[in-house]
């Protein structure tokens, strides 16, 4: 569960990125977080992964209260949230298997655990025959699937996908969204951060709209108007 209570974030330059934001995402939900560039979406991601501290307010992430969390607990909290980046952030000289396994190695998983878990996750995302490939040998859609597998490998409670289809054509975008839906159906909470109007409106999900640092709409109508277009 993610809870923001009256969260405000003001950067050192004085710009107010978030203004008294209240939101709650329950376990097992699928949520779109939408808004134009500069609306505060990226700040929300950085706050819930403890990359930033709020100026005021409180944040709870999967049972961790971030205003009181100890530094040594932050890595454990972050393991409960798998982040998928728009630019994939794959290690170019490592195979698909090694890229996904990396997430397990940094938390101290054994070779036996890695050999059992990584093939399972690659199969889940449809890359069971791509484990020995390097990133440059894959299509954009396949690279995004590797990024999803890496985010999933430590079995997080929640996946945060930051513009996961921004570099993909419409068909590949739809396939990635269907994959995220299937992951959500297995019980993982999914938050997709996007400004793509057509993508959001194609799926009937909860939509949290943010603009100028404020939540301006939160509903299950699955409809979003991107005012930038």
Give the label of every model feature segment:
Residues 57-65:
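Conserved ABC transporter NBD signature motif
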Residues 153-157:
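A short, proline-enriched helix->beta-strand linker immediately N-terminal to the Walker B motif
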Residues 94-101:
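Short coil-to-helix segment of the ABC ATPase nucleotide-binding domain corresponding to the Q-loop/switch region
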Residues 170-172:
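Helix N-cap at the start of a conserved alpha-helix in ABC-type nucleotide-binding domains
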Residues 159-162:
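Catalytic Walker B motif of ABC-type/P-loop ATPase nucleotide-binding domains
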Residues 49:
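Helix-to-loop junction immediately C-terminal to a conserved catalytic motif
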């Amino acid at each position: 569960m993610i809870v923001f209570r009256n969260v405000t974030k003001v950067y050192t330059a004085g710009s107010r990125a978030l203004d008294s934001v209240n939101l709650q995402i329950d376990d097992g939900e699928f949520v779109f977080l939408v808004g134009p560039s500069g609306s505060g979406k990226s700040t929300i991601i950085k706050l819930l992964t403890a990359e930033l501290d709020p100026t005021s307010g409180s944040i709870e992430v999967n049972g961790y209260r971030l205003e009181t969390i100890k530094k040594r607990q932050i890595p454990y909290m972050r393991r409960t949230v798998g982040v998928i980046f728009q630019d994939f952030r794959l290690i170019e000289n490592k195979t698909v298997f090694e890229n996904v396994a990396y997430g397990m190695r940094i938390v101290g998983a054994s070779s036996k655990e890695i050999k059992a878990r990584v093939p399972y996750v690659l199969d889940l995302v449809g890359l069971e025959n791509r484990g020995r490939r390097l990133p440059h040998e894959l299509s954009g859609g396949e690279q995004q699937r590797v990024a999803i597998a890496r985010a999933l490998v430590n079995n997080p409670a929640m996946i945060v996908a930051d513009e996961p289809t921004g570099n993909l054509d419409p068909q590949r975008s739809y396939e990635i969204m269907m994959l995220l839906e299937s992951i959500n159906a297995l019980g993982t909470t999914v938050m997709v951060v996007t400004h793509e109007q057509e993508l959001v409106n194609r799926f009937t999900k909860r939509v949290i709209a943010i603009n100028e640092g404020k939540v301006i709409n939160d509903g299950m109508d699955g409809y979003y108007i991107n005012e930038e277009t």
